[in-house]
Amino acid sequence: MKLKNILILILCIVLCPPIVMAVSDNTVYTEFTGGNSSSTGNGTEQSPYNLFEDALNAVEDGGTICVGEKGAFVNSSDDKPLVINKNVTITSKSDTAPEISIRKAGVVLGGNVSFKNVVLSLVNGNHA
């Protein structure tokens, strides 16, 4: 009986950590490839979201958004700011500091947001 319990415990230790790591990895990728279409990408490293807003909508609270070398883009014709209401880290995928270009009326941080190795740029003079 003891041997059976020990074997079950060893199997649980060996098999469970990969499952836990897969569930807890909440990283979403974005890289602007052109156009205003969000139809490209699914948020993985191999197929990042084209638009930053899609990555922001997909990332869970406490997660990370990785920005590719080509940067990220937020485009809008309205006069509302970009609102980030999640606890999220926004970081570069590599050692470069890609630019996150924002064409909105500013940025409102409603959550605990950390920017690491990225350049945040407000690029449209038409917004107040």
Model-based region annotation:
Residues 63-64, 88:
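Surface-exposed loop/turn positions
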Residues 8-18:
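Bacterial N-terminal signal peptides
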Residues 79-80, 85:
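Predominantly extracellular beta-rich ligand-binding scaffolds that present long acidic/polar faces
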Residues 33-40, 62-63, 69-74, 94-97, ...:
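Acidic glycine-/aspartate-rich tracts in secreted/extracellular proteins
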Residues 85-128:
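Right-handed parallel beta-helix/beta-spiral solenoid domain characteristic of secreted/periplasmic
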Residues 19-54, 71-72:
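Right-handed parallel beta-helix/beta-solenoid
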Residues 1-5:
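Positively charged n-region of N-terminal signal peptides that target proteins for export
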